[in-house]
Regions:
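Bacterial Sec-dependent N-terminal signal peptides
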Residues: 1-25
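Exposed boundary/loop context
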Residues: 12, 124, 158-161, 238
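Extracellular or lumenal secretory-pathway regions
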Residues: 19-129, 133, 142, 146-147, ...
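Short, glycine/acidic-rich beta->alpha junctions
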Residues: 45, 118-119, 154, 163-165
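Beta-strand-dense domains in secreted/periplasmic systems and polymorphic toxin scaffolds
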Residues: 137-139, 173
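Short, surface-exposed, low-complexity cationic segments
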Residues: 140-164
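A contiguous pocket-lining binding segment that forms or flanks enzyme active sites
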Residues: 165-180
Length: 271
């Protein structure tokens, strides 16, 4: 019991860990992020998690709502976050640099890269989303073509994940295949710190090396039915955590939730 409680506390502390402050927010934008994919039986499914985009004048930070709320309890939403392999992304606009941290059981991976410039094409199309007048733009990022809707009513060049660079906050963005979609559902005017992310304990890779590793590992046909097929025996100690009658597998050493089944991996980056 003590070990289980300790693991749950470590999960919380891992999510809540803070580092040096580099900026503070002007506001926080909240998005639903969905992925159209297939389950282990090949049936179409929609994966979904909530994201928080912390927007400052110098930097932005995109993470899960669980991390934003410092909620480290084992839950289905946390399991979904691990399943969707969403990166925590810190964009330092002043330095034109991006740091991304992604948990891929049983390790966390950290990449550093220059801030990518999306060559957006602005159009005259408009659409009202959540009461905001939005303008359509198209652009390509890391091998994927995107359609984004932005609003000049919120004068920020920020957007979810690594999408940014438009003359207004990105309200909705969807890739050309209709697989990945980010949709704003709320904003809050609050001032909180934006901190540097990363740790000496994380595995350091280039963005392209991590992309290749994910393609080889998560893109393997075995992955949906055996999400830990590639993990060496003894790499972690697995515990069963009971949360209100629901049991979750948690890595005691990795501080990660462990998937028993997963869905077909759908990469955000192709090149």
């Amino acid at each position: 019991m003590q070990k289980i409680l300790a693991t749950m506390m470590v999960l919380a502390l891992t999510i809540a860990a803070q580092a040096e402050r580099i900026d503070s927010t002007q506001f926080v934008a909240f998005y639903n992020y969905t992925i159209q994919t297939q389950d282990e039986e090949g049936q179409n499914v929609t994966d979904s998690i909530r994201l928080a985009l912390l927007v400052g004048t110098r930097a932005t930070y995109c993470t899960t709502v669980l991390s934003y709320n410092k909620d480290g309890r084992a839950s289905q939403e946390m399991l979904d976050a691990f399943s969707m392999h969403f990166q925590n992304v810190l964009t330092d606009v002043e330095k034109s640099s991006v740091v991304a941290v992604e948990p891929i059981y049983p390790y966390r991976y950290e990449t550093h890269e220059p801030m990518a410039k999306v060559d957006w094409t602005l159009t005259g199309d408009t659409l009202t989303i959540s009461g905001l007048l939005c303008h359509r733009a198209t652009g390509k990022l890391y091998g994927k073509q995107w359609t984004a809707w932005y609003t000049e009513e919120m004068p920020s060049s920020a957007g979810p994940w690594k999408l940014r660079g438009l003359p207004g906050l990105i309200i909705k963005a969807e890739d050309a295949e209709g697989i990945h979609c980010f949709t704003l559902y709320e904003t809050k005017n609050e001032v909180i710190d934006i901190n540097m992310i990363g740790s000496p304990e994380y595995q350091k890779l280039s963005r392209k090396k991590l992309m290749e590793f994910k393609k080889k590992t998560l893109g393997n046909p075995r992955y949906p039915k055996e999400p830990t097929y590639y993990v060496p025996e003894g790499a972690d100690e697995v515990l069963e955590v009971n949360v209100n009658g629901t049991f979750y597998s948690v890595g005691y050493n990795s501080h990660m939730m462990i998937l028993q089944k997963s869905h077909v991996y759908q990469p955000l980056e192709l090149e």
